């Protein structure tokens, strides 16, 4: 269940459910529409959570290729999930759990296990009712303790994979009070060559949805510009909804502006009225405005960051991008992320690194592109360029230091080179006997102890931090003494595991790496300390002396 320091949950309201479906094509932005709705409801004083339904047969997203699917987002309990849950955590400022991600693989696995154990007492196990009942159970359990639960159904209406979920939603609406259920459908409204907004794709999508037994209460048109009134009226007429239930969600440069745009259209007020909770909302002058203040502030400069990785898909590093953006919001600067392909570290990419104010090497798996990452780290270290290494970036910083400072030319990670004579990065002891790939790494939130009077202690404002992990390998203890004697300080650790490295301020203005993924806990209103410190170093402030009040998590 999502947890926060304080909750506004009012059991007298009962639970409200908002289901968000999509039509015409995938990738329309259902998740951002749903998250923006949740953000506005939270601003109005309601306790909000979310559920993402992914109709694939994978149990989780842990074994999916980031190049095809985008990043694997890690939750505090170790759940490896779709990147949309990252958007929900960032927009709603909550911590979610693996129970908030429903996949076909997880649902079928659970039902089959129950059948094998005899729980169904010899009955024929079918999609209806057994699979649909399990889907409904998962939604209700995830919603416990919240006023509103927003459920996003992945994929597009009409996809065969999604049919059991839409049937479960139809049953769900039949079982709950009418005032407790709201269906939002997000569709594409394209322009014709003559500049006319076309409604036919939306009409057909709603027709498909209605054929399943679902009637949308709200329609959100994804478009390059706002829907004009004629378009809204036409959609309302043919889709059988009031004109005031048709909303625009036009393209924007920054997704954090979407809540403000749909608020201007009155989406939040309409939702509250339909769910019969408008009278329970905070007065407008008492609602949370920090989000608006942050995303509409006038910036006072810009910073260029080189992100050195091997995946061409921007979504593969979404949380890193967002964490850099959050740090920019805190320091009141625009952050321009320059992509540097670590597989093609030629003169062109070297020039891009030289032009950058800082270098970030993110996480990843596999040998492809690692030599380019090592070269980028060497360049940052030798030229006093502020540097942040994350997970694999942390490990490659150890490899780079071993090679170029300790003169261990063949040093490497045992994950990437099984025959290396100097495995400065080696497999975690508990991983030796594990054969399965999915869900078997060191995952989720773990506490790291931090040495006093270090850069890490200054950034985190104390002698410990709790961040999320996703790795099988760690620094080889046999090399720690030699590395530290040569100037590489391991300032954060969990028992005998090294989890933060840094260089002393007299050796480098800002050089830090983390075995964990601080980007997964970064929020627009609470930026991640290592990312804030990176910008501090670029802007000329000494992150080694920044106070806790200036950089807080």
Swiss-Prot record:
InterPro entries: Class_I_gatase-like (IPR029062), CTP_synthase (IPR004468), CTP_synthase_N (IPR017456), GATASE (IPR017926), GATase1_CTP_Synthase (IPR033828), P-loop_NTPase (IPR027417)
GO biological process: 'de novo' CTP biosynthetic process; pyrimidine nucleobase biosynthetic process
Active-site residues, as the UniProt record annotates them: 391, 517, 519
GO cellular component: cytoophidium; cytoplasm
Stretch list, region Amidoligase domain: 1-277
Binding sites annotated in the UniProt record for Mg(2+): 84, 152
Subcellular locations according to the entry: Cytoplasm
Predominant subcellular localization, coarse grouping: cytoplasm
Pathway: Pyrimidine metabolism; CTP biosynthesis via de novo pathway; CTP from UDP: step 2/2
Cited SUPFAM superfamilies: Class I glutamine amidotransferase-like, P-loop containing nucleoside triphosphate hydrolases
Domain Glutamine amidotransferase type-1, chain residue ranges per copy: 307-544
Protein residues bound to ATP: 27-32, 84, 252
Swiss-Prot/TrEMBL catalytic activity: UTP + L-glutamine + ATP + H2O = CTP + L-glutamate + ADP + phosphate + 2 H(+); L-glutamine + H2O = L-glutamate + NH4(+); UTP + NH4(+) + ATP = CTP + ADP + phosphate + 2 H(+)
Database matches in PROSITE patterns: GATASE_TYPE_1
Keyword terms: ATP-binding, Cytoplasm, Glutamine amidotransferase, Ligase, Magnesium, Metal-binding, Nucleotide-binding, Pyrimidine biosynthesis
Subunit structure: Homotetramer.
Family as reported in the entry's similarity comment: Belongs to the CTP synthase family.
Function: Catalyzes the ATP-dependent amination of UTP to CTP with either L-glutamine or ammonia as the source of nitrogen. Regulates intracellular CTP levels through interactions with the four ribonucleotide triphosphates.
NCBIfam families: PRK05380.1, PyrG
PANTHER family in alphabetical order: CTP SYNTHASE, CTP SYNTHASE-RELATED
Entry protein name: CTP synthase
Organism: Haloarcula hispanica (strain ATCC 33960 / DSM 4426 / JCM 8911 / NBRC 102182 / NCIMB 2187 / VKM B-1755)
Encoding gene per record: pyrG
